[in-house]
Amino acid sequence: MTFKRRNGGRNKHNRGHVNPIRCSNCGKCCPKDKAIKRFIVRNIVEQAAIRDVQEASVYEGYTLPKLYAKTQYCVSCAIHSHVVRVRSRTNRRVRTPPPRFTRRKEDTPKPGQPGQAPRPAGPGAAAAPRV
């Protein structure tokens, strides 16, 4: 029978059994080696209040502590929440991490928003308005 993945979707090589974990999203029981694990590092204080907290701090140069959280998802929750994405048969074998997208700056206008110049007329442009 053909197989989809070289590892069978698990990281259990030559172990008979691994203990289950609970999904952080839905609570489903999932083997620890099959679960999709992500380590989230965030600031304890939200971005808008960091400067206020640092100015109110007694200590000079005090670095705010971070919040470390390990989330473990079952396969269905990871796909549903776009933690991992479905890949084509050839791309499943690619082991390099996907490119990280940078956020668009807030001051650049999005296409089709007010304040943007109209599109130039071209071969695919709409016909002249009827009178």
Swiss-Prot record:
Region span, Disordered: 86-131
Listed Basic residues bias regions: 86-95
Keyword Phosphoprotein belongs to the record: no
A biological process from GO: translation
UniProtKB keywords: Ribonucleoprotein, Ribosomal protein
Entry's Gene Ontology molecular function annotations: mRNA binding; structural constituent of ribosome
GO cellular component, one term: cytosolic small ribosomal subunit
Residue spans of biased composition, Low complexity class: 113-131
The keyword Ribonucleoprotein appears for this protein: yes
Family classification: Belongs to the eukaryotic ribosomal protein eS26 family.
Protein name per UniProt: Small ribosomal subunit protein eS26y
Organism: Arabidopsis thaliana (Mouse-ear cress)
